[in-house]
């Protein structure tokens, strides 16, 4: 009888232990389940927040599109204006460069031409002296012929470079191209007329190299 009771007690103890163990296991499983469910719910909420967009305001969208169009139009106009300005600057630069080249060429030619003028003056003086000498002797001087030929070639060359003489008489005095060396009273001439050329003047491409030295009537 005692043995039976003892066995029963032992069984009860084992059953209680088993029940306690099972409860603990159930609690652990429930806790894990609850934790997992919470995580799933949190993830769902996050996904929902990310996926579901805010309510769209179509008026704002229209305003944004209109502003973008205006900005794009302004940018296009600005770029177009910039291109036009650059083209104008390039054209002006080319014109200035061409003008500077021409100016440099004319300036170099001007200096060279001015250096030639005394040579031409000396040839003309020599020619005039020889002509007067030959009139007295009534002889043909070969030196005179050589001087004449040389002078003709010089004149031909300077004409080819755009140099022209100022040597006309009986025209109105012009202070822009004439320098009055003396004034004479001549009743046969109009007042302020070029009566005589003492030294020729020269013009290069419309620009005065040297004024003509003249005698003027009064």
UniProtKB/Swiss-Prot annotation:
InterPro entries: GrpE, GrpE_coiled_coil, GrpE_head
Transmembrane region(s): none
Molecular function (Gene Ontology), one example: adenyl-nucleotide exchange factor activity
Key word Ribosomal protein present: no
NCBIfam families: PRK14150.1
Subunit structure: Homodimer.
Protein name in the entry: Protein GrpE
The encoding gene: grpE
């Amino acid at each position: 009888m005692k043995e039976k009771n003892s066995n029963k007690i032992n069984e009860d103890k084992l059953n209680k232990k088993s029940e306690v163990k099972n409860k603990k296991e159930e609690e652990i499983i429930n806790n894990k389940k609850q934790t997992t469910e919470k995580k799933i719910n949190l993830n769902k909420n996050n996904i929902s927040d990310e996926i579901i967009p805010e309510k769209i305001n179509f008026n704002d969208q229209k305003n944004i599109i209109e502003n973008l169009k205006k900005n794009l139009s302004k940018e296009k106009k600005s770029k177009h204006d910039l291109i036009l300005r650059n083209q104008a600057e390039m054209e002006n630069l080319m014109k200035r460069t061409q003008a500077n080249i021409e100016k440099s060429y004319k300036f170099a030619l001007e200096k060279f031409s001015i250096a030639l003028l005394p040579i031409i003056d000396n040839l003309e003086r020599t020619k005039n002296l020889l002509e007067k000498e030959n009139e007295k002797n009534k002889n043909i001087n070969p030196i005179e012929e050589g001087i004449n030929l040389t002078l003709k070639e010089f004149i031909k060359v300077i004409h080819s470079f755009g140099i022209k003489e100022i040597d006309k008489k009986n025209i109105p005095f012009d202070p822009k191209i004439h320098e009055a060396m003396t004034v004479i009273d001549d009743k046969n001439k109009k007042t302020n007329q070029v009566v005589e050329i003492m030294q020729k003047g020269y013009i290069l491409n419309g620009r005065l190299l040297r004024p003509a030295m003249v005698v003027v009537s009064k």
